[in-house]
């Protein structure tokens, strides 16, 4: 594995308080779930090393507080994100309605190079519970209306689709990073047609 190229990918998880953001991160990184709810204060992160397309990737996964007083964490927190995960609780309709606000908040704060094609992933969490309020179809329609955002229904408690979802998150984040590397490899743009740069102009002689 030492010959593989390594990458650090910054992934931000957003969503209302108590939708299961911390539990999803802990299930993915530590294979652990706790029934004791503890609100995240500000932001925290975990890292996990995975292999995507024969490339070693260190995912830096940022878990954020969902309370309103923490909603504006500042430009520095969002800057440099390679993927944004939007999480809602399938038993809490308001958490689904607020996905628009969280998506807008991210785009405003992060100011990605190409906002229309920035990689988001939506997770409908707590599918292990019986009192579901948001249908799969409704969630899929919302994702389709936002440029076909990938959508997964998960259970942090049971580990349902958590590994699969984060594999897609890593893959999409890596693709964004690769595109950014290609753009940065291009030299500065040269403007042609300037009168002073035309051949034969005596004032532009390089002799």
From Swiss-Prot:
A GO molecular-function annotation: GTP binding
Residues annotated as signal peptide: none
Compartment(s) where it occurs, according to its Swiss-Prot or TrEMBL record: Early endosome membrane; Late endosome membrane; Lysosome membrane; Cytoplasmic vesicle, Autophagosome membrane
Disruption phenotype: Pupal lethal with no gross morphological abnormalities. No effect on overall brain structure or photoreceptor differentiation and axon pathfinding. Accumulation of autophagosomes and reduced number of autolysosomes in fat cells. Impaired lysosomal degradation of endocytosed Notch and Boss receptors in the developing eye. Accumulation of endosomal marker Hrs and photoreceptor membrane protein chp/Chaoptin in the brain. Targeted knockout in photoreceptor cells results in progressive, stimulation-dependent loss of synaptic function and ultimately the degeneration of the entire neuron.
Database matches in Pfam families: Ras (PF00071)
Keywords of this entry: Autophagy, Cell projection, Cytoplasmic vesicle, Endosome, GTP-binding, Hydrolase, Lipoprotein, Lysosome, Membrane, Nucleotide-binding, Phosphoprotein, Prenylation, Protein transport, Synapse, Transport
InterPro entries: P-loop_NTPase, Small_GTP-bd, Small_GTPase
Motif (Effector region): 37-45
Disulphide connectivity of cysteines: none
Lipid anchor positions (S-geranylgeranyl cysteine): 205, 207
Membrane topology of the entry: Lipid-anchor
Top-rank taxon: Eukaryota
SMART domains: RAB, RAN, RAS, RHO
CDD domains reported in the protein's UniProt record: Rab7 (cd01862)
Described purpose of this protein according to its UniProt entry: Small GTPase which cycles between active GTP-bound and inactive GDP-bound states. In its active state, binds to a variety of effector proteins playing a key role in the regulation of endo-lysosomal trafficking. Involved in microtubule minus and plus end-directed endosomal migration and positioning, and endosome-lysosome transport through different protein-protein interaction cascades. Governs early-to-late endosomal to lysosomal maturation. Controls endocytic cargo sorting towards the late endosome facilitating its eventual endolysosomal-mediated degradation.
Family: Belongs to the small GTPase superfamily. Rab family.
Protein name in UniProt: Ras-related protein Rab7
